[in-house]
Each structure stands twice: as structure tokens, then as C-alpha cells.
Design a protein with these regions (language model features):
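Hydrophobic face of amphipathic alpha-helices that form TPR/SEL1-like repeat modules
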Residues: 50-56, 85-93, 122-130, 155-163, ...
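C-terminal motif of bacterial Sec signal peptides marking the signal peptidase cleavage site
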Residues: 27-29
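Canonical positions in the second alpha-helix
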Residues: 73-74, 110-111, 143-144, 176-177, ...
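Terminal, low-structured helical/coil segments at or just beyond the last alpha-helical repeat
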Residues: 265-300
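Short helix-capping/linker turns of helical repeat alpha-solenoids
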Residues: 40, 45, 55-57, 77-79, ...
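Structural signature of tandem alpha-helical TPR/SEL1-like repeats
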Residues: 60-69, 97-107, 130-140, 164-176, ...
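Bacterial N-terminal signal peptides that target proteins for export
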Residues: 5-19
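Bacterial signal peptide processing site
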Residues: 31-33
Length: 300
């Protein structure tokens, strides 16, 4: 089974895990009256599916079943965006669509045959998560990475950097995925690089100052793990980072606010065992309740 959100999948057409056609929903808002005609071409079918997702002026609900039907027709007629959406729907399931890894794989294979490099990224996820075929996943991710897809560059870099003989290449891919100083980067790639520079794992060059800068960049990009690590550095005044308790606690709350269990647990510990613990008990209890709800949710 594919874990929802396991690799921060950011589908470029706006599709989100566990939801049906939200990318289409966004585009549907721009549709006019043309959707009243019966679609003939694959593109028209896809546009019609978008229109069905847009509630009409009378306030009727979106027609997800109809949208799925027309998206499938467009996909069967080789309209690539529809093919990719069908793969995503079966990859994660939802809105009446039963998750089916093999059906998702067949749609993505079709997309690959049509020339999609992005489809290789998703096939890599299927191979890694479901089939546990690391070699095949690496091959798919390499194709997508070479095409400039940042998520694939990140996953490829992460795997390669776990072994000493491929660590150097792994770091190169992570640097590409991080897009440091540019838009479109993967914050988790900055964090992965920072961990390597901080620990020197697998023969990586140790450079604490560079690691700190990468943690800071990844924190600004919203990665909760980086926010937790950077918060600890600020609280302790370690590795050349000036001690700043206020900023450290603020950073820790940012990580906890993303429902990152480790950050929530650390925040609770500080609130209950630090100065003025009695004054912070109400906040600590609120975070504890939040953590308990998260743990219960993960059990389901």
C-alpha cells in the first residue's frame, strides 16, 4: 500500500493526495458555457470533466462520477494530462475510487510510452513503496531526475547518499533538488544535505557551518525536521549558532504546528520542565492532546 504523502508528492497539475481532480477544480473555475456541448476530442473530454467538477449557478454539487468517466475517456484517447490523473487516482484512491497499485502502474506506464518523464517519478514511488524494488525505483527516478524533476532528484540523492561508494553522486543530486537560492526546490533535500555535512556520514565532508546554513534554508522552506534541528541549535547555542531561546521556541512551535510528533514531544518537554512551567501548563496540555490525537489517527 502506498503511504499517503510519503514523499511529499507535489503533482505539477495541482493534484493532491486523497482528493479527486483538485487541479481540475482550479482550472474549472475559468470554464465558460462551452461545456454544454457534448465533447468530441480528448481535450474537450478533459475540459468537460473539469466543468463537471465546477458547481453550477444553482448550487448543485460537483459531479465526481461524471468527471471520472470523462477523464477516463480522455485518457483512453491518449490525452496525457488525463492519463496522469488516472494514475494518481488509482495510486492513492479516494472519492469512490478504490486504491489499486497495479491499475495506477498501468496508467503511468501508458504515460511513459507517451513520453512523460514525470510518470517515471510516480513509477519509482510504486516500485519503492509497493514492490520494494529499489533498483527499478532508482532507474525510474534517475530518468525523472535527469529531466529536471526536483522530487525525483531528491529521492535519487537520498538513496545514493546512503552508501559510501555513491555518496558523492547522491550529494550532487541533493544539491540539484535543493535549488538553493532558487524557487522550486525541495526543502527536505536541504535537510538531507545538512545532515550529511553535520555528521560526515558515509564519507561526506564534515562542515558544520554549511550544515547550519542548510538547516536554516530548509526551515524557511517549511521542512519540520529542519525546523526542529535548527530550533535545538538556537536553544543550545551550538555549532556556531548564537543562543536565542525566543527564536528557538518560535521555530520549535513552527515544527510542532505542522503536526510533527518529535517537535510536539520536545515542545511539551520544554514547557513542562523549563522556567515558569506552571504558566506554560495550559499550552503544554493543549499540545499533549494534539499529540495524542495524532497518535490515535496513525493507528487507524
Amino acid at each position: 500500500m502506498i503511504a499517503r504523502g510519503a514523499y511529499n508528492v507535489r503533482m505539477k497539475r495541482g493534484f493532491r493526495i486523497g482528493m479527486v481532480f483538485p487541479g481540475l477544480l482550479l482550472l474549472a473555475a475559468c470554464e465558460g458555457e462551452s461545456n454544454k456541448k457534448t465533447p468530441q476530442t480528448p481535450q474537450q473530454m478533459y475540459e468537460y470533466a473539469k466543468a463537471l467538477l465546477k458547481p453550477n449557478v444553482e448550487g448543485d454539487a460537483s459531479d465526481f462520477a461524471g468527471a471520472l468517466q470523462w477523464t477516463r475517456k480522455a485518457a483512453e484517447e491518449n490525452w496525457l494530462p488525463a492519463v496522469m490523473d488516472m494514475g494518481a487516482l488509482y495510486m492513492y484512491g479516494g472519492k469512490g475510487v478504490q486504491q489499486n497499485v497495479e491499475t495506477a502502474r498501468s496508467w503511468y506506464n501508458k504515460a511513459v510510452e507517451m513520453g512523460s518523464k514525470e510518470a517515471h517519478w510516480f513509477l519509482g514511488i510504486l516500485d519503492y513503496e509497493s514492490a520494494h524494488d529499489i533498483e527499478s525505483a532508482l532507474n525510474h527516478w534517475r530518468i525523472a531526475a535527469e529531466a529536471g524533476i526536483a522530487d525525483a532528484q531528491y529521492r535519487l540523492g537520498r538513496l545514493l547518499s546512503q552508501k559510501a561508494d555513491s555518496m558523492k553522486e547522491g550529494m550532487q543530486w541533493l544539491e540539484k533538488a535543493a535549488r538553493i537560492g532558487q524557487k522550486g526546490g525541495v526543502p527536505q533535500a536541504c535537510t538531507a544535505l545538512a545532515n550529511l555535512y553535520m555528521t560526515g556520514a558515509n564519507g561526506a565532508p564534515k562542515d558544520a557551518a554549511k550544515a547550519v546554513q542548510l538547516y536554516k534554508a530548509a526551515s524557511g522552506g517549511g521542512d519540520p525536521l529542519a525546523q526542529l534541528v535548527y530550533a535545538e541549535l538556537l536553544l543550545a547555542g551550538a555549532d556556531g549558532v548564537p543562543q536565542d531561546t525566543e527564536k528557538g521556541m518560535s521555530m520549535l512551535r513552527l515544527a510542532a504546528g505542522q503536526d510533527y510528533p518529535r517537535a510536539i514531544a520536545r515542545l511539551i518537554n520544554i514547557l513542562r520542565n523549563g522556567p515558569d512551567a506552571e504558566q506554560h501548563e495550559k499550552e503544554a496540555a493543549a499540545w499533549e492532546n494534539r499529540l495524542n490525537r495524532l497518535m490515535e489517527k496513525q493507528k487507524k
